Design a protein with these regions (language model features):
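Phosphate-handling active-site elements
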Residues: 10-27, 158-171
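Active-site glycine-rich loop that binds ribose-phosphate moieties when present
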Residues: 26, 30-31, 46-55
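DPxDG-like acidic metal-binding loop motif
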Residues: 1-21, 37-41
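Conserved glycine-rich beta-strand-loop-beta hairpin in the small C-terminal domain of fold type I
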Residues: 150-152
Length: 182
């Protein structure tokens, strides 16, 4: 998706920027569901297949630890499983948006929830939960799987605690990263 967005933006620049960012995002929606977001960037609420975007305020200063397990996940398979099962819970999207608008980092973290975690195969779910447990044990305000996974992220208000989680996780998972919001 990010590659497609870069190509669209590059072609737009090469042709004298005839399309607005919103027009480019709409065009990107025909290529893939995540392309509009990658064209526009920033913080946004994605609805529909991910192509309907509402800009939101940026998170307050924070640090993230991202950890990608070695297994892969089939996005179509997970969507089929979500459609086939009764979900235990749903994210509090309205509450999360309100917390973002209020600049309440802890409120955002409390509302992080990913329904795809509920339908992961048992072995993969166990790995995701182990990573979440490490992040939370180091003081993450919240931890969740990103999208259809398998990357798991933790949201921290303290860089030293985030660094501790990163140090522990990188011993077991090569693709573990420490970063802050831009």
């Amino acid at each position: 998706s990010s590659d497609a967005a870069a190509v669209l933006r590059g072609l737009n620049a090469l042709t004298g920027t005839p399309l607005t960012p919103m027009e480019l995002a709409e065009l990107g929606g025909a290529v893939g569901s995540d392309v509009p977001y990658c064209v526009l960037g920033g913080t946004a609420l994605a609805e529909g297949r991910g192509e309907v975007l509402t800009p939101l305020p940026t998170l307050p200063p924070c640090t993230f630890v991202l950890c990608k397990p070695t297994f892969s996940i089939s996005t179509p398979q997970l969507f089929a499983l979500v459609d086939a099962v009764k979900l235990r819970a749903r994210p509090d999207t309205a509450g999360l948006v309100a917390a973002l608008k209020a600049g309440d980092l802890a409120g955002v973290a409390r509302r992080m929830y990913n329904v795809f975690g509920d339908v992961l195969p048992e072995r993969q779910r166990r790995t995701v939960e182990e990573i979440r447990a490490v992040l939370l044990s180091h003081g993450a305000l919240g931890a969740s799987m990103s999208g259809t996974g398998p990357t798991v992220f933790g949201l921290f208000d303290d860089e030293a605690r985030a660094r501790g989680a990163w140090e522990e996780l990188k011993e077991s998972f090569r693709d573990t990263f420490l970063t802050s919001r831009v």
